[in-house]
Amino acid sequence: MTIKLHDLKPARGSKTPRTRVGRGEGSKGKTAGRGTKGTKARKNVPVTFEGGQMPIHMRLPKLKGFRNRFRTEYEIVNVGDINRLFPQGGSVGVDELVAKGAVRRNSLVKVLGDGKLTVKVEVSAHKFSGSAREKITAAGGSVTEL
């Protein structure tokens, strides 16, 4: 026998109707399963209520400061990274750094001066630190800001 889509039925007992409580004196009537008297019988206790203990949102410190929405974020590449990724020297731009996996696509690049540079490179990036600019020119290379 093949089962057809229109013959499918839920398993017996898996679909039970919602119990309507507090409707008359029958089962689940009157106190509606809440017991007698007390806060829990009369109304809901807030989820955040901790029984008189100082609540967690008041125990934790407030966050200080703010996050500037207009800040420009740069991907950082050090001079030592350029030396390691381009041992033969040459022209180094954002596209070459993306191809080598040093930075992500469509990101602004800032070159910092950590590490040593032993090869002549022509670097083009969005920003340069002073020490990076000095090290690149000292190695015989050139710096171009985009």
Swiss-Prot record:
Biased composition (Basic and acidic residues): 1-10
Superkingdom to which the source organism belongs: Bacteria
GO CC, alphabetical: cytosolic large ribosomal subunit
Region of interest: Disordered: 1-52
Any single biological process term in GO: translation
Database matches in InterPro entries: Ribosomal_uL15 (IPR030878), Ribosomal_uL15/eL18 (IPR021131), Ribosomal_uL15/eL18_sf (IPR036227), Ribosomal_uL15_bac-type (IPR005749), Ribosomal_uL15_CS (IPR001196)
Residues annotated as transmembrane: none
Pfam families: Ribosomal_L27A
Entry GO MF terms: rRNA binding; structural constituent of ribosome
Family per record: Belongs to the universal ribosomal protein uL15 family.
PANTHER family registered for this protein in UniProt: 50S RIBOSOMAL PROTEIN L15, LARGE RIBOSOMAL SUBUNIT PROTEIN UL15M
Complex and partners: Part of the 50S ribosomal subunit.
HAMAP family assigned: Ribosomal_uL15
Function text: Binds to the 23S rRNA.
Record-given protein name: Large ribosomal subunit protein uL15
Organism, as annotated: Mycolicibacterium paratuberculosis (strain ATCC BAA-968 / K-10)
Organism classification: Bacteria, Bacillati, Actinomycetota, Actinomycetes, Mycobacteriales
